[in-house]
Amino acid sequence: LIVPHTLCNVENPSTEIEFAGEKLSSPIIMAPVAAHKLANEQGEVATARGVHEFGSLYTTSSYSTVDLPEISEALQGTPHWFQFYFSKDDGINRHIMDRVKAEGYKAIVLTADATVGGNREVDKRNGFVFPVGMPIVEEYLPEGAGKSMDFVYKSAKQRLSPRDVEFIAEYSGLPVYVKGPQCREDVERSLAAGASGIWVTNHGGRQIDGGPAAFDSLQEVAEAVDRRVPIVFDSGVRRGQHVFKALASGADLVAIGRPVIYGLALGGSVGVRQVFEHLNAELKTVMQLSGAQTIEDVKHFKLRHNPYNPTFPVDPRDLKLY
């Protein structure tokens, strides 16, 4: 729960921040999401334009449906990171990192929590295949494999280790954010390997079934990190108060995915920009009602955690269904 402060100056709250030497209009950034062309024919180009217009940070997915140069052109200098599904073939990994560096990416986000695909029973029943290609990775796959995520995941490395974090950092020379740690032990392993940041996520609840909500893991991760490196948070963010609570719980940046794709589907780049603007406006309102003037103020807020102890009726008659 947010415990508001009173008798505070909240006339002109600001969400602007400086992160890694870059000025951003908000701590709300674009999460890596695959296959934007499923939502809009312009795909990642439209998303990148919307993020650029808003003035935030864009994270490119390995499974984008637009190639790197086109995304970079649409971003027009907006800071951008690359989300990396690590291949079993180090030659492929080196080539992708060479391309990423050439396009001016500022960091690499290593996805460590989804080296295989989840059991998507609906997709199996529907016989779903991608109707669009994924140019960043498909040149390395067997002919026709780009239409099936099974082939894509089979090319991903399942034997990930801290050494892979070291390899990416050494070869690319870029900061490496490890995406997926939800406990203290994984944080320590990542930092010992040279990670420059931790990305807390449960992959939007789309992979392992029965895992914790990402927000429930954030406090433990933040305590383990102890401000040694930045923390990015995603999964389940739908309102400005969610952003506020994540920042107050230890996150430095809050990434959104599904809401952006909804905006992309409905309004292209304008829809993307408006999703960010709407969430940011909500964040400002929550800041004013809580007594926070800046994002630094928000990050020093203490949330009140009330225990959740549900009780369930034993007698079905207590359900009062009739």
Identify the meaning behind each predicted range.
Residues 1-21, 120, 127-160, 296-298, ...:
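An N-cap/entry alpha-helix motif that binds or orients negatively charged groups
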Residues 1-2, 75, 101-104, 112, ...:
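Structural signal for hydrophobic packing residues in well-ordered secondary-structure cores
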Residues 24-66:
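Glycine-rich active-site/cofactor-binding loop and its immediate structural neighborhood
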Residues 25-31, 235, 253-255:
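Short FAD-binding loop at a beta-strand-to-alpha-helix junction that anchors the flavin cofactor
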Residues 35, 48-49, 73-74, 88-233, ...:
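Alpha/beta enzyme core
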Residues 53-93:
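A gly/proline- and charged-residue-enriched helix-loop-helix capping module
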Residues 56-60, 228-235:
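A short, small-residue-rich loop immediately preceding and capping a beta-strand
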Residues 260-261, 267-322:
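C-terminal extensions of enzymes
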